[in-house]
Amino acid sequence: MTGMPQTPLLDRVNFPSDLKEIDDRDLPELARELRDEMIDAVSKTGGHLGAGLGVVELTIAIHKVFNTPEDRLIFDVGHQCYPHKILTGRRDRIRTLRQEDGLSGFTRRAESEYDDFGAGHSSTSISAGLGMAVAAGLDGSDRKVIAVIGDGSMSAGMAFEALNNAGALDARLIVILNDNDMSIAPPTGAMSAYLARLASGRTYMGFRDFGKKLTAYLGKTIDRAITRAVTHARGYVTGGTLFEELGFYHIGPIDGHSFDHLLPVLRNVRDNQKGPVLIHVVTQKGKGYAPAEAAADKYHGVNKFDVITGAQAKAKPNAPSYTSVFAEALIQEATLDEKIIGVTAAMPNGTGLDKMAELFPSRTFDVGIAEQHAVTFAAGLAADGYKPFCALYSTFLQRGYDQLVHDVAIQSLPVRFPIDRAGFVGADGPTHAGSFDTTFLATLPGMVVMAAADEAELKHMVRTAAAYDEGPISFRYPRGEGVGVEMPARGEILQIGKGRIIKEGTKVALLSFGTRLAECLAAAEDLDAAGLSTTVADARFAKPLDLDLIRQLAAHHEVLVTIEEGSVGGFGAHVLHFMASAGLLDHGPKVRTLTLPDQWVEQAKPETMYANAGLDRAGIVSTVFNALGQRQAGVGFAG
C-alpha cells in the first residue's frame, strides 16, 4: 500500500444511509477499503488500531441493517469506534484522530449524533443501552438499541449487573458480544451459519414466545415441563448458556468477519426481537493487517507507523519512564521481601507489573477489568499480612473508590496504591486524565498521599510504601519519561509527612507537589533574574502535610504558590485549609494555588495542556507577578 488508498466503494458512503444502496455482495470489498483507510489514517496519527480492524465487518453490518442514528448504537470502551467514525460523516477528519482540536479517539456525544453514548472506560455499554431501551419503551418507540461489548469488558461486574437487570426487565435490548480472544476459534462452515439463522429466526423465537404465553395459563408442574422443552429445543440450536439463565436469548457464536453470518442474524433480530438478545460474535483483533495480526498485542495502541513494514516511530528516550522505574523498584523490594504482592486490573503492561510477573508469577495478579475487585482483593491480602501493591491508572482507580473507602481506609489496611498516568495524558483526553486522585484520596482519614517529583523520588516512595504498615498509602507519577536525575541504587525510606527545600530564597516560595518541580525550578531562575529571590520546595506529601515546612514558608515569604497536577480541592486546598485554621492567612503571605483547570480539558500534547493551564514555567512566573500586583504577560485559562 503506497500513497492514499484507492477506495471507490467507500467513496460512495458518507453516512450509514448510503450503505443501503450497496449490494450485499459488494460488502467484503467495502470492508477491505475501510480497513485500508483506517490503517492509513492511524499510521499518521497513532491510536488504537487493532480493535477497530477487528470490527470492520460488524460495524458495516450494523449500520446497514439498523436505522442509525434513530436506532441507538453504543460501543463499549470505544477503542473500536474508528470504522464507525469513518462511516458516519467524519471520514474527512479521520486523520485528526487524537490530535489537538481533532476527532476524539472514543465516541463522544458532542462530536456526532451517531455517537449515542460517550466512552473511554470499559463495561458501561450494557447499562447505558438498557437505560435507552427502557426510555424507548416509555416513549412508545420501536427504535432498537444495540450495545457492542468486548469479551475483555465482560470481566467487570458492572456488565453482569446490567445483564441481570436487563433480563429481569425483559427489555428490548440487543447486546453484541465481540469476542476477540484468540483462544476461542471462530466457527466455520455453512452449518454454523445455518444454526445461527435458525436460532434468530421466527420459527424458534415464535416457539419460545408461544411457550411463555402457554405457561401463563397452566399449573407450575406443566409450566416447568414446557420450560424444559423450550430450553431443550434451544439447546439443540446453540446450547444453554449463562446468558440464557440471566434472561437473554443467546445466539452464536458466529463469524464476525462473514457477512453471510452477520447480515441474516442481525436482520432476524431486528425484525423479531421480543426481549433481550445477546449475539456472540467471534472476531480477530488486528484483522486484515499482517503486522497487527502477528503482534502480541495486535496493535492495540500504536504510535505513528510505516504502513508497509508496520514499524512504529518511537523516539529514543532521554531518561527511563516512570512506569519502568516503578516496576524495577518494586521488583527490587519484592526480591528482598516475599510478602510483597503485585495486583493490577487488566493493565500489566501499562503498569509495568508484567516485569514482576516474569520473576514472581505466583505473587503477581492481573484480575481483569475489575478495579472494585482489585482493591478489595488487595485488602484481603493485607488483612492476612501481605504487602499488596495495587497498581492502577489514576483514572481507573476512580472505579474502585467505595472499596478504597469501605474495605481499605476504614479498616486501616496497609494496601499500597501506585497511581500511574497522574495528570494530563495527552491524546486520550479527559476520559483518561489523572485529575482527581489526590482530591479523593487526601480527604480520607488515615490515608498517606505522596507524589513523586522525579524518578529518583519515585524509587524512594516505592521503598517507603513497602516499609509502611500503619495503613493505606499511595504515590502518584505521570506517564512518560523521567527528568533524567541521578538514580540511587535503592530507594530511601522517607519520613512520613516531611517535604524538602530544594532552593532557598527570601521573597517568593514555590511549593510543588509532583513532577511540576522542574518547572518550578525553571520559574525560580526567571524570578531570581527579575529580583524576586525564590524558594522552591518539594512537598512530597499531600497527606499528612508537612506543617512545619508550610509555617516556615508562610513566615518568611511575601508570596506562596502551590503547584500540582491535580484538580481543584487537592493539595493546594489542604494547604489553604491548614493555613486558615492556623491563622497563617490573617497577616501572612499572598497565597495562590495552581491546579488543573476546573473544566474538561481536551486532547493535545501534554506540554501544551500544561502550558494552557498555567502550570509551566511561564504560567508560574505570571502567577507570582500577578500576586505582587506587577505587570507581567500571563498564560492560562480564561474565566
Swiss-Prot record:
Pathway: Metabolic intermediate biosynthesis; 1-deoxy-D-xylulose 5-phosphate biosynthesis; 1-deoxy-D-xylulose 5-phosphate from D-glyceraldehyde 3-phosphate and pyruvate: step 1/1. Its EC number is 2.2.1.7. One of its GO terms (biological process) is 1-deoxy-D-xylulose 5-phosphate biosynthetic process. It comes from the Bacteria. Its cofactor is Mg(2+); thiamine diphosphate. It catalyses: D-glyceraldehyde 3-phosphate + pyruvate + H(+) = 1-deoxy-D-xylulose 5-phosphate + CO2. Binds 1 Mg(2+) ion per subunit. Binds 1 thiamine pyrophosphate per subunit. Pfam families: DXP_synthase_N, Transket_pyr, Transketolase_C. SMART domains: Transket_pyr (SM00861). GO terms for molecular function: 1-deoxy-D-xylulose-5-phosphate synthase activity; magnesium ion binding; thiamine pyrophosphate binding. CDD domains: TPP_DXS, TPP_PYR_DXS_TK_like. Coiled coil: none annotated. Thiamine diphosphate binds at H79, G120, H121, S122, G152, S153, N180, Y289, E371. Keywords: Isoprene biosynthesis, Magnesium, Metal-binding, Thiamine biosynthesis, Thiamine pyrophosphate, Transferase. Mg(2+) binds at D151, N180. PROSITE patterns: TRANSKETOLASE_1, TRANSKETOLASE_2. HAMAP family: DXP_synth. Catalyzes the acyloin condensation reaction between C atoms 2 and 3 of pyruvate and glyceraldehyde 3-phosphate to yield 1-deoxy-D-xylulose-5-phosphate (DXP). Belongs to the transketolase family. DXPS subfamily. Homodimer. This is 1-deoxy-D-xylulose-5-phosphate synthase. It comes from Agrobacterium fabrum (strain C58 / ATCC 33970) (Agrobacterium tumefaciens (strain C58)).
